[in-house]
Amino acid sequence: MLDINQIKEIIPHRYPFLLVDRILSVEDGRKAVGLKNVSANEPYFQGHFPGYPVMPGVLIIEAMAQVGAVAVLRLPEFAGKMAFFAGIDRARFRRQVVPGDQLRIEVELQKLRGTVGKARGAAYVGQELAAEAELMFAVR
């Protein structure tokens, strides 16, 4: 398990764009499971949407990318580097994510060739699938 301070040693994101609070498990270069506690105090809820706060889908995808980046950047050859989005396929949003929800984010790397790779991510609230996507990334 990794706490927020350990996560910040691996990925460069910071408030308000650090979208993972804890890593529950990680297999370096293979997969990671993380948590995001969705608080009513998140800055994006001021405008998305007033009176009906919903976590933007793009931020759920970004949370997946950050969890996946932890797994990739723990590999010795990528220590101290950054992972960048290179593409996204088959993104689907199945359930709204609202204040008070806890997102469990599961990301599994499917392919890594040199510094470019592909991963599959899913985000759950409880046992309910909230979002899923295939993510492409490049490490620099």
Curated annotation (Swiss-Prot):
GO terms for biological process: fatty acid biosynthetic process; lipid A biosynthetic process. Belongs to the thioester dehydratase family. FabZ subfamily. It is found in: Cytoplasm. The gene is fabZ. It catalyses: a (3R)-hydroxyacyl-[ACP] = a (2E)-enoyl-[ACP] + H2O. InterPro entries: FabA_FabZ, FabZ, HotDog_dom_sf. It comes from the Bacteria. Keywords: Cytoplasm, Lipid A biosynthesis, Lipid biosynthesis, Lipid metabolism, Lyase. It comes from Pelotomaculum thermopropionicum (strain DSM 13744 / JCM 10971 / SI). One of its GO terms (molecular function) is (3R)-hydroxyacyl-[acyl-carrier-protein] dehydratase activity. Involved in unsaturated fatty acids biosynthesis. Catalyzes the dehydration of short chain beta-hydroxyacyl-ACPs and long chain saturated and unsaturated beta-hydroxyacyl-ACPs. GO terms for cellular component: cytoplasm; membrane. The keyword Transferase does not apply. The keyword Metal-binding does not apply. Its main location: cytoplasm. The active site is at H48. PANTHER family: 3-HYDROXYACYL-[ACYL-CARRIER-PROTEIN] DEHYDRATASE. The lineage of its organism: Bacteria, Bacillati, Bacillota, Clostridia, Eubacteriales. Its EC number is 4.2.1.59. This is 3-hydroxyacyl-[acyl-carrier-protein] dehydratase FabZ. Disulfide bonds: none annotated.
